[in-house]
Every structure is written in structure tokens, then in C-alpha cells.
Amino acid sequence: MHQVRTLPTEFSSDGETLRGHFVLPLGEGPFPGIVKFHGIPGSPDQVSGAATLLAQAGFAVLTFDFRGFRDSEGYFTLSGQIDDARAAITHLLESDLTVDTWSGIYAASWGAAVAICALAEDKRIDAVCLRAPVFDTLWFSQLPLVRASAESLRDTDSTQMRGLDDPEIFERTLEKMVEDSRVHNPIHEVSKISPRPLLIVHGTDDIGIPLAGVKRLYELAGEPKDLVVVEGADHNLSDPRAYEITVNTIVEWFKKQWNP
């Protein structure tokens, strides 16, 4: 297996410092760049998995924590994350590690919703891959599951998301999530990704994000687009075979976008 190298990095968004890593191939760059957007809360390890496999395939991958998560400053809001996404794209494109002729986004779950909303207006990205996307932020933000998950995270590991242990911030975070979702909703924005290539990958066993909703998102997207449904894949890719199929699909698709 090819090794990769990681470089710590940080950048600013609305005055908040966001921290992460560049995951890089060995050898001399610059490399084609991809920004990775995590979900809520996303894994504490953003380097392993897809980012490492993409780096092994020749891409420079920028991973980072959105505001309010782990090592980054600030507090979570959807509108803030959209600003973070654009700041991350700027950081990628301004880096000497990346080429200036092509760039991509790989985003999962809630991060996929952020990607769509950011890229509806930001045209600097050339290819977009979404895994298990939250297709409707307003629907999702009002699910009982969201509060239950936030409470569970608060009680088990509040370091993953800032402010959960403050009752006032906790309630305001959930309220603002709904408020922002009335303004920023991928179901209304996904058509604006076209004419940039779009890949959506989803699993048959994802009980949190219904496949029917993902298919609706796909239908609303313009060409060129592809939808890959992975048999046996749940939201967190806990099945090893489904994980392998999913990440290989993503890596091979990005390789084709960089070398059509």
C-alpha cells in the first residue's frame, strides 16, 4: 500500500480558526486538490479512510473540522458552515500543494448538504461527490433523531462539538439549525451544481437517510450526474464489503474526472 504524508494546516472563516490536515501523496506536487466535508459530528479522524485512499490515488486532500467541532473555533450553524466551506475552497486553491486547473469536493451526510448549498453560488469547484447526503435540511433538522443524537453526544463525548454542555447554547444550536435550513436547503439548490459533474453514492441499508429522498435529490440535479446505490451499505459503512465498494467507487470516479 502506498504511503501518504499529512501536514497540519489552519485557516480563518469569519474570524474563527478552522484546523485540519492536508493528506498528500508522496513525491513532488502540485497535485489535483479535493476538499473533504464531514457530517455531524463526523469522525475525530478525518485523515484515514477516503482521504488517505484519495491521496494514494494522487490527490491532495484538505480535511478540516467545521466551526464548533473538535479542534476548530466557534459554534455550529449551517450558515456558518457554508462560509467555512467557501473558506476551505479558498485555502485549497491558494495552496502551493495543489494545481490551479482543477479541484473537487468529497462530502458526506450533513457535509453533503453544506457542499450543495455552498457550491450553488461558488463555481470554483470542478467535480462534486456526495455520500449518503442529507437531501433536505429542513426535514432533517426537525427529526427527533437530531435532538436525541445531540443529547447522546453531550453525555458521552461533549468535546466533539462545542457548546453542548451549556443548556442555552444547546437549545439555540438546535433552533438555529431549523432557522438556517429554511434558507439553505440542498433540495432547492442541487440543480445549480450542473454543468459540473456530480456523483451521489448511497446505501440500501441507510435507515437514517432514506434512499427515496436521495433519489429525489438526484432527479433534481442537472447533467452530468451519476447515482450509485451500494447494496448492504448503511450510513456509517459498517459492513467491510460495502465500505470497500463505496470508497473504491469514489476514488475511481475522481480519477476519471481528473483524467477524463
Regions from the language model: what does each represent?
Residues 1-29:
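N-terminal cap/lid segment of alpha/beta-hydrolase-fold proteins
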Residues 31, 36-42, 204:
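Active-site glycine-rich loops that stabilize anionic/oxyanionic intermediates
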Residues 39-52, 66:
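The serine-hydrolase catalytic nucleophile loop
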Residues 41, 65-70, 135, 234:
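Alpha/beta-hydrolase active-site loop signature
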Residues 41, 69-101:
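Catalytic nucleophile-loop/oxyanion-hole region of alpha/beta-hydrolase
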Residues 51-73:
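Conserved alpha/beta-hydrolase
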Residues 106-117:
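Glycine-rich nucleophile elbow surrounding the catalytic serine of serine-hydrolase chemistry
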